[in-house]
UniProtKB/Swiss-Prot annotation:
Protein name: Putative hydro-lyase Dshi_3152
Similarity field: Belongs to the D-glutamate cyclase family.
Domain of life: Bacteria
Assigned keywords, A-Z: Lyase
Transmembrane spans: none
NCBIfam families in the record: PRK05463.1
One Pfam family linked to the record: D-Glu_cyclase
Record bears the keyword Cell membrane: no
GO molecular-function term, one example from the UniProt record: lyase activity
Taxonomy of the source species: Bacteria, Pseudomonadati, Pseudomonadota, Alphaproteobacteria, Rhodobacterales
Enzyme nomenclature, EC number: 4.2.1.-
Amino acid sequence: MPWPAHCRHVTGEVGIYQTLKHKPLAEVRAAIRAGQYCSHTAGLGKGFLQANLAIMPEAYALDFMRYCQRNPKPCPLSGVSDTGNPMMTTMGGQIDIRTDVPAYNIYRDGRLAGSVTDIRDLWQDDFVAFALGCSFTFEHALQQAGIALWHIDNDKTVPMYRSGIDTVPAGPFRGKMVVSMRAIPEDRVAEAVEISRRFPLAHGAPVHWGDPAGLGITDLARPDWGDPVPVPEGHVPVFWACGVTPQVALEAASMPICITHKPGHMLISDIPEDAEIPILRPQDQHTSQTQQGETHDTHA
């Protein structure tokens, strides 16, 4: 599917984004599925686990699962699809991972080949999809505590940086940890640490705060992904492990094809943000669908 014209030149459609911030998850997902919204998901689907996405041929899946197990901080595994099945049933009975992410990155032989908003035409019978929890999940809790987040207030994508921290390799997967940054008032850093610690499926507590040089980051104004954000006087840069880390590992693996979310453009699941176990049983899926009043077509 070609990149929609209304998504080509802007970070986000401000009017649509501001509207969706106050809509229930069912309406947010419907807008994404219809191609009406193709920007970042920070601040959307409040109360539900957001997830990074990695899709690859089954031949690589076991090594990738090992990579996630060995690196739980940047790669908190929250869902794995059945081979060839695009319905991520344990994360929501109505989730179709081919259409329910605002934007996808396509990698061929380890190189970014382009971005699309729909991967139905690229889907393969041997694909396995992995969902990895995202720090967008705990942002709702930070906001509820009165901690403002500049990127959400200004419709920007959170900045992400390649750190100098090595991950533990598994098979062909290896690389540096990616971190996301949020500027937090100095007198509230300890509170932000404790709040985010309650969300282990969304990277949990930060890995570092203060001088970015401690992570090998030389210039906060030049993130590797996302948008630069200011660090006002009296604020401290706080860094969390980030689910873009697997994209670095996927580049190193040089698979013939793999697909990820575009950084900042997440899969929003039906799993409550504070769930201890990221699995929806069949009866839970029915309850979730009823509560959301959601309808779905199978894209046949």
